[in-house]
Amino acid sequence: MSGGGGEMEERLLNGSETEQRRESLYLRKKIWSEVRKMWRIALPSTLFRVMSFGCVVVAQAFIGHSSETGLAAYALLQSTFIRFIYGIMAGMSSATETLCGQAYGAEQYHMMGIYLQRSWIVDTFIATLFVPFIVLAGPILRLLGQNVVISETVDEIYPWVIPYLYSIVFTMTMQMYLQAQMKNAIIGILSTLALVLDIAATWWCVSVMGMGIHGALLGLNISSWSVAIAEFVYVFGGWCPHTWTGFSTAAFLDLIPMLKLSISSGFMLCLEYWYMSIIVLMSGYAKDANIAISAFSICQYIYSWEMNICFGLMGAACVRVANELGKGDADAVRFSIKVVLVVSAVIGVICSALCLAFGGQISYLFSDSQAVSDAVADLSIVLSISILFNIIQPILSGVAIGAGMQSMVALVNLASYYAIGVPLGVLLVYVFNFGIKGLWSGMLAGVGIQTLILCYVIYKTDWELEVKKTNERMKTWTLNLPAVQSTTISTRDEERK
């Protein structure tokens, strides 16, 4: 009997071990599947941002070799008006990401095309409101005391910025629309081809045609609109048969709720874009301003490249959360959040360690000055900590965007960045004389507080309740498929007629 009992015990133990191995294998497969889904979104999204940033850098490089005044005018226009407007438009496009992601998860595919058309209407309207600011950029800069010659050059080049502004409306919204339905490869391919076209077109316009700064901006417009046109062809040409059923009068319904969500989205993201610009502006008033600005700009450049990875991961977090909320699976939402946070934390630790390891050596890629190198090395610790925080914070923002919490994130950004980060930086620089390290420490404090608040909010979020809210939003905003089809102008239907 004792022998039989021992055998039974052994079989139970073996069965338990087998069950544990099965559960472990299932978990590994589940994690790997989630990681693959995440990178399918994050890689093309990152590539899009890197290539878009590259097109702006190409224009600046060609302008710099053509005219010092032109370079100063372009840099001033880029760092103030274009960056300001781009931040708002990029933020507003995240509303498209939220709605399309949730609609895709809920299998309300026909609504994705409607949401895309509504975003075109709303974003084009907002972009048009900014046109007078671009037209009056020169007088505004002169009013602010900027150099007259540079501001007059801005008067010459502003017309080239207006078509670029409208290209952003379409490229950003269509990117979010395609990204929400996992059609990511086309985004990366078009972005890469656009950069190649941008280099070729800018070289031709500047070096061959002798158009100078105007040629550089023409090249930028050619590349940006080529992406928009290619995306139009992809969407209209039948590659999105379930989500694009043609133009519809339903696009003009529920524009006010769409406008509210878009504005809160734009406000949320633009606060992050402006934060670094304000910090750089403040560095110009620090002791040894030339060294301070140079060192700060180098650190900002490193920080900006890392931000491209961050925003790619943010897009992945947003789409995955929105998709699973649309499906009504709260457990899958939690699992997606855990996976993307772990992956981003690993990337953050690696980038942070590289920054610490190479410290001042990084500066020699941009400057031969020993003083600048020492200043960058002095900032390397706070820069590495910033990178670590910065890789986590966008993920949390992406989760919030996927759930439609843009207004909450905007308030958190406003409080942590502008009520804490900027004032603390000013205090450390001008009262305690900590120099640019104090300025960056103030910025780091703002990012750190924002990260902690978002961590708490995401941790306390009732995802079952968010699923219910998503279902209610889908019911409120979703049109019945037959009704949509009756108001749809389909090119293929017209051809058959």
Curated annotation (Swiss-Prot):
Example of a GO biological process term: xenobiotic detoxification by transmembrane export across the plasma membrane
NCBIfam families in the record: matE
GO cellular component: membrane
Cell location: Membrane
UniProt superkingdom: Eukaryota
Ranges annotated as spanning the membrane: 43-63, 70-90, 121-141, 157-177, 186-206, 216-236, 261-281, 291-311, 339-359, 381-401, 416-436, 438-458
Family, similarity comment: Belongs to the multi antimicrobial extrusion (MATE) (TC 2.A.66.1) family.
The entry's keywords: Membrane, Transmembrane, Transmembrane helix, Transport
Protein name: Protein DETOXIFICATION 25
Record-linked Pfam families: MatE
Topological category with respect to the lipid bilayer: Multi-pass membrane protein
Molecular function per GO: antiporter activity; xenobiotic transmembrane transporter activity
